[in-house]
Amino acid sequence: MRFAFTTVSLSLLLSSLVASDAASSDVQFLTALVGDYQDHKTDYIKFFATAKDVPGDLSTLATKVLTYTDDSYTTLLNDDSLNVSNLEAYATSLPWYSRIQADAGGKGSASGSASGSGSAKSTASAEKSSGSSASASSTAGGSSSKGGVSELVAPVGAVVGALAVALM
């Protein structure tokens, strides 16, 4: 009986440690993302001007982060409706994802890292050759679209505005 109790106690302890590690890695990711945005606002604004399929969680999070004056915005991660995995997956599409990954302590998959690094290199070379970050973003973002520019203006404007205001 004592052995069973000890085994159950140990299992519960290990489960809580694993859950704690996951929350810690989410905090590291969010802190790295917000910090990177604060250091490179122009890059983000130009990227989101041409970005597609921006997760709704990102604009919701950006709006909520607006209300915080310090890093206590990480308490938003306790909200079960926030899909951090979705945000992390989207972040891998950012051309500078390797910066975020490095700041977050190397969290993420190797394929996400390789993809982010390659995009960052192609964006950097495109910026050097064209002198325009906006054209580099649109080149790196791809050229296929389902609708015209008018369909993107409102959603992109809302996301860019929320990010710009929330993370200043």
From Swiss-Prot:
Glycans are attached at N83. The GPI-anchor is attached to the protein in the endoplasmic reticulum and serves to target the protein to the cell surface. There, the glucosamine-inositol phospholipid moiety is cleaved off and the GPI-modified mannoprotein is covalently attached via its lipidless GPI glycan remnant to the 1,6-beta-glucan of the outer cell wall layer. Residues 111-149 are annotated as: Disordered. Its main location: secreted. Keywords: Cell wall, Glycoprotein, GPI-anchor, Hydrolase, Lipoprotein, Membrane, Secreted, Signal. GO terms for cellular component: extracellular region; side of membrane. It is an enzyme of class 3 (hydrolase). It is found in: Secreted, Cell wall; Membrane. It is a lipid-anchor; GPI-anchor. A lipid is attached at S143 (GPI-anchor amidated serine). Residues 1-24 form the signal peptide. Belongs to the SRP1/TIP1 family. This is Repressed By RIM101 protein 2.
